[in-house]
Swiss-Prot record:
Molecular function terms, GO-annotated: NADP binding; phosphogluconate 2-dehydrogenase activity; phosphogluconate dehydrogenase (decarboxylating) activity
Chain's gene name: G6PGH2
Catalytic EC class: oxidoreductase
Native source species: Oryza sativa subsp. japonica
Residues where NADP(+) binds: G28, L29, A30, T31, M32, G33, N51, R52, T53, V95, Q96, A97, N123
Gene3D superfamilies per record: 6-Phosphogluconate Dehydrogenase, domain 3, N-(1-d-carboxylethyl)-l-norvaline Dehydrogenase, domain 2, NAD(P)-binding Rossmann-like Domain
Compartments where located: Plastid, Chloroplast
Record-linked Pfam families: 6PGD (PF00393), NAD_binding_2 (PF03446)
Residue numbers binding substrate: N123, S149, G150, G151, H206, N207, Y211, K284, R311, R475, H481
Official protein name in the record: 6-phosphogluconate dehydrogenase, decarboxylating 2, chloroplastic
Length: 508
């Protein structure tokens, strides 16, 4: 049981002394944790903060004072931190996923009481959250795994929040989360996602869609640059213009900004910083988890998978440079395989259409994965509500999420976004431009794995008769796996080799 004698805070802002005891505390004061704590305090909720290193506690309290004397109480030991909170206590963790979460929980649990709650706001593997829910329940402690999206700026000014686990833990701080979350015309960008590890799983898929989005945008840039010869300044203008239309989104907006930034280390001031960045993309694992889950649930997610493969291949920088040298020595051109004379305005418009259609495929794949997992786990995920809370604060926030929400509102059992009437119409209208862009990229030798995978996904999904019949015949021949017929029910097996030899003999 917790002691009734909490230690005084090690440091606090001037406003904290007159504030009531906090209902909520936050442990883990790296960039995301510090900014979320200040966000909560700015919304009028006193908050206690704790970190293993005292310097980050002091830095957070100093920021709280500098940013408006926000009610933040800093603690340097877990006991004083926990006992500073009024009951039922809620402790938010924003530490590195995995062992660090378990270690932080172990440090805090001795001072928590039954009915208190732990909220893990990291990018955690959902099964770890489900394990911790059971462990916490054995002590009478409530637990939430809460996805937090929006990066540093979102954490400070309003993220998208995806909590899942014990609904009582959510209800205890619902008012706080609704104030701290990003706000749109449809309300706060937070909702109780579902039980168990639902919140972390939804955030994982959000990140998988994010991988796809970023890959598609990078491919659009590459085609504009290499086929159209657009300068960084022109590309900045293109993305800024796109952000005023159907492609309006956080990622398109920041892409436009990136192309306006000069290299601060270039004395001439003429070079773009983006051109000096090594072409190796980092990752933290959520994209890989998304692709693994899609495979386990038999959900096709080729756009997201292509984006993950793209990151893997980008990491092979030395191998790619060596391969280019070997192939050039054998006669492979070092530049474009084919020079394409194209009007820039037409190219920009067609790339816009290809990017939009490809993005729909990426979101469709993510939504289908969410539904499949929801069915498997009995989470009863509301896809329209998830689209709603992604409209603001998060990295994949986009104008067309409102239309995705409406599509699932119209039909919660929608098989695929591609067959929603509105999106279907747009896909058909854009397919010619989409095909043109992918074809020109192939002709020129420009890699567009995301757009190509998206187009193949679209063509495969709309095809009423695939060549899978031949694959099933092959499986039956070498493995006796049987097959179904289109003209009668049941499973069938054929002695293919015997019949083929007999047929070949008869032909001779």
């Amino acid at each position: 049981m917790a002691s009734p004698a909490p230690a005084p805070p090690a440091a606090s802002s001037s406003a904290a002394g007159s504030a009531p005891p906090p209902r909520i505390g936050l442990a883990g004061l790296a960039t995301m944790g510090q900014n979320l704590a200040l966000n909560i305090a700015e919304k009028g909720f006193p908050i206690s903060v704790y970190n293993r290193t005292a310097a980050k506690v002091d830095a957070t309290v100093s920021r709280a004072e500098a940013e408006g004397a926000l009610p933040v109480l800093g603690h340097r030991d877990p006991r004083g931190f926990v006992l500073s909170l009024s009951r039922p206590r809620t402790v938010v963790l924003l530490v590195q996923a995995g062992r660090a979460v378990d270690a932080t929980i172990d440090a805090l649990v001795p001072y928590l009481d039954a009915g208190d709650a732990i909220v893990d706001g990291g990018n955690e593997w959902y099964q770890n959250t489900e394990r911790r829910i059971e462990e916490a329940a054995a002590r009478g402690i409530l637990y939430l795994g809460m996805g937090v999206s929006g990066g540093e700026e979102g954490a400070r000014n309003g993220p998208s929040l995806m909590p899942g686990g014990h609904i009582d833990a959510y209800n205890n701080i619902r008012d706080i989360l609704e104030k701290a979350a990003a706000q749109t015309e449809d309300g706060a960008c937070v909702t109780f996602v579902g039980p168990g590890g639902a919140g972390n799983f939804v955030k994982m898929v959000h990140n998988g869609i994010e991988y796809g989005d970023m890959q598609l945008i990078a491919e659009a840039y590459d085609v504009l640059r290499r086929v159209g010869g657009l300068s960084n300044s022109e590309i900045a203008d293109v993305f800024a213009e796109w952000n005023r239309g159907e492609l309006e989104s956080f990622l398109v907006e920041i892409t436009a900004d990136i192309f306006t930034v000069a290299d601060p280390l270039d004395g001439s001031g003429g070079g773009g910083l983006v051109d000096k960045i090594l072409d190796k993309t980092g990752m933290k694992g959520t994209g890989k988890w998304t692709v693994q889950q899609a495979a386990e649930l038999a959900i096709a997610a080729p756009t997201i998978a292509a984006s993950l493969d793209g990151r893997y291949l980008s990491g092979l920088k030395d191998e790619r440079v060596a391969a280019a040298g070997v192939l050039e020595a054998e006669g492979m051109p070092s530049g474009l395989l084919e020079t394409i004379n194209v009007d820039k305005k037409m190219l920009v418009d067609r790339v816009r259409q290809a990017l939009y259609a490809s993005k729909i495929c990426s979101y469709a794949q993510g939504m289908n994965l969410l539904r499949a997992k929801s069915v498997e786990k009995g989470w009863n995920l509301n896809l329209a509500e998830l689209a709603r809370i992604w409209k603001g604060g998060c990295i994949i926030r986009a104008k067309f999420l409102d239309r995705i929400k409406k599509a699932y509102d119209r039909n919660p059992e929608l098989a695929n976004l591609i067959v929603d009437r509105e999106f279907a119409r747009e896909m058909v209208q854009r397919q010619n431009a989409w095909r043109w862009v992918v074809a020109r990229a192939v002709e020129a030798g420009i890699s567009t794995p995301g757009m190509s995978a998206s187009l193949s996904y679209f063509d495969t999904y709309r095809c009423s008769r695939l060549p899978a019949n031949l694959i099933q015949a092959q499986r039956d021949l070498f493995g006796a796996h049987t097959y179904e017929r289109i003209d009668r029910p049941g499973s069938f097996h054929t002695e293919w080799t015997k019949l083929a030899r007999k047929s070949n003999g008869a032909a001779i």
